[in-house]
Amino acid sequence: MISKQQISEIISNYDLNDLAIATVCSHSSLQIFDGARKEGLRTIGICVGQPPRFYDAFPKAKPDEYIVVESYSDIPKIAEELVRKNAIVIPHGSFVEYMGTESFAELAVPTFGNREVLEWESDRDKEREWLEGAGIHMPKIVDPEKIESPVMVKYHGAKGGRGFFIAKDYEEFKQYIDPNEKHTVQEFIVGTRYYLHFFYSPIREEGYKLSEGILEMLSMDRRVESNADEIFRLGSPKELEDAGIHPTYVVTGNVPLVARESLLPRIFALGEKVVEESLGLFGGMIGPFCLETVFTDKLEIKVFEISARIVAGTNLYTSGSPYSDMIEENLSTGKRIAQEIKLGAKTGKLDLILS
């Protein structure tokens, strides 16, 4: 992984009055570009092949310029060009997934956030070590041969809802498992899914204070999954099973949510614990992150995963959410990222938020 010292040397040669935001044209890039534009920062879209035509339909979010590469593996080749343009890279799920964790970790361009989190987020065992070390309640790990109730089986690195299936017993597990893929088997939690969108700032001082910096809860969403969200219109689970139809969990979109106000203290406590643990483990998780949770009918909150960067569910709120509007009107996660970068440049603290 490229060192903080190397990144600091690159930043020292940047014109801090002419910074640019760069990201891959996918996932949440429209929101990122829109937020940067609203904060007066230049924008650079990295795209494979021709620039996306549909960006022309959204002129306020269209990047100021494009850099075209033939494949994601070619992105390191444009590092010097990005540096010449005073670019700061904003990672999102597609960026890291398609480029590859190792290549992204070595990219010689200042990047918003702490790249050390990649090691802890991409490995489900280390992710569990982090979250349980923070005192977070997670679904229990189950021995496949001892499955007595429904379990969720997840392949490591599964993205966008792919690589998941539910098994009711060991026979069903054996029927669907790919033994060559690393996987996790955990209890299936019955409840309502909430994806909680947080933002951790080590340099702001006003707000929900932590041991260092502040925590913000900007929004929340629930994912729309195909075909799980509509499949039971066709019949009962038993009827579907008899017909050879099985639920899948591919994310196709997102819907907005708010939580009961009485749950907000617990929601903030979850975010606080995760950030405080990250400070001790790897120097802190900077910027946006999402806790993927299930709220049970006993009002327990179980965390089943963390995404340590901007998530696509925040795209619902390019003009603000019911929560972020109470921080600042029309505040999106993309805009909040741009604000943090501007504040870091103004206060001489970019080293704290870039890696």
Curated annotation (Swiss-Prot):
Mg(2+) binds at E292, E305. 5-amino-1-(5-phospho-beta-D-ribosyl)imidazole-4-carboxamide binds at H27, S94, N254. Pfam families: DUF1246, DUF1297. GO terms for molecular function: ATP binding; ligase activity, forming carbon-nitrogen bonds; magnesium ion binding. Pathway: Purine metabolism; IMP biosynthesis via de novo pathway; 5-formamido-1-(5-phospho-D-ribosyl)imidazole-4-carboxamide from 5-amino-1-(5-phospho-D-ribosyl)imidazole-4-carboxamide (formate route): step 1/1. GO terms for biological process: 'de novo' IMP biosynthetic process. Its cofactor is Mg(2+); Mn(2+). This is 5-formaminoimidazole-4-carboxamide-1-(beta)-D-ribofuranosyl 5'-monophosphate synthetase. Residues 101-332 form the ATP-grasp domain. Coiled coil: none annotated. The lineage of its organism: Archaea, Methanobacteriati, Methanobacteriota, Stenosarchaea group, Methanomicrobia. HAMAP family: IMP_biosynth_PurP. Keywords: ATP-binding, Ligase, Magnesium, Manganese, Metal-binding, Nucleotide-binding, Purine biosynthesis. The keyword RNA-binding does not apply. SUPFAM superfamilies: Glutathione synthetase ATP-binding domain-like, PreATP-grasp domain. The gene is purP. Catalyzes the ATP- and formate-dependent formylation of 5-aminoimidazole-4-carboxamide-1-beta-d-ribofuranosyl 5'-monophosphate (AICAR) to 5-formaminoimidazole-4-carboxamide-1-beta-d-ribofuranosyl 5'-monophosphate (FAICAR) in the absence of folates. It catalyses: 5-amino-1-(5-phospho-beta-D-ribosyl)imidazole-4-carboxamide + formate + ATP = 5-formamido-1-(5-phospho-D-ribosyl)imidazole-4-carboxamide + ADP + phosphate. ATP binds at residues 144-195, 225. The keyword ATP-binding applies. Binds 1 Mg(2+) or Mn(2+) ion per subunit. PROSITE patterns: ATP_GRASP. Belongs to the phosphohexose mutase family.
